[in-house]
């Protein structure tokens, strides 16, 4: 079946690449996300796909506020019991907040990567590998010490 051959990363995006940033609107952001992913996950499972990775699609068809609302509630994606991929590296949700550029967004990227890891992200999509690895190692250490307490 398809599940034996294909793995799927499923990313949320409102609209198309051509219009996704033109006034994105959600009545209830989290509810709409969970309905979207529940349907898509079921469709893939019905096709026999076993390995599915969820990606909230930070920066794709979302306002600055939408992106931060998603990050604030990231742990709630755990209800799907699937790996969660987060890609915020140098995204406008960081540099627009500070009025800087993508090249100046490393510190913000590292902070949000760390927050994402603490809130359940399993995979990070990054530009700056060394810094991301440091975040992963620090969070793994923190979690290992917490588990021993």
Where are these regions (language model features)?
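Short, small-residue-biased leader/transition segments that mark boundaries at the very start
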Residues: 1-6
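Non-cysteine beta-strand/loop elements that form the S-adenosyl-L-methionine
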Residues: 7-15, 56, 82-89
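Hydrophobic residues within beta-strands of alpha/beta enzymes
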Residues: 8, 52, 124-125
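A short acidic, helix-capping loop that chelates divalent metal ions and anchors anionic groups
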Residues: 16-23, 93-98
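Active-site glycine- and acidic-residue-rich loops that bind
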Residues: 26-36, 58-74
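C-terminal helical cap(s) of enzyme catalytic domains, especially alpha/beta-barrels
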Residues: 126-149
């Amino acid at each position: 079946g398809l599940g034996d051959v294909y793995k799927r990363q499923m990313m949320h995006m409102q609209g198309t690449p051509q219009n996704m940033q033109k006034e994105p609107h959600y009545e209830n952001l989290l509810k709409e996300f969970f309905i979207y992913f529940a349907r898509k996950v079921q469709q893939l499972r019905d096709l026999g796909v076993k390995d599915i990775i969820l990606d909230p699609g930070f920066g794709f068809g979302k306002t600055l506020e939408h992106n931060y609302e998603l990050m604030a509630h990231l742990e709630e994606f755990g209800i799907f019991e699937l790996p969660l991929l987060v890609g915020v590296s140098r995204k406008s949700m960081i540099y627009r907040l500070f009025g800087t550029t993508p090249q100046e967004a490393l510190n913000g990227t590292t902070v949000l990567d760390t927050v994402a890891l603490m809130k359940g992200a399993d995979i990070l999509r990054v530009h700056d590998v060394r810094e991301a690895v440091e975040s992963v190692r620090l969070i793994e250490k923190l979690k290992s010490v917490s588990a021993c307490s």
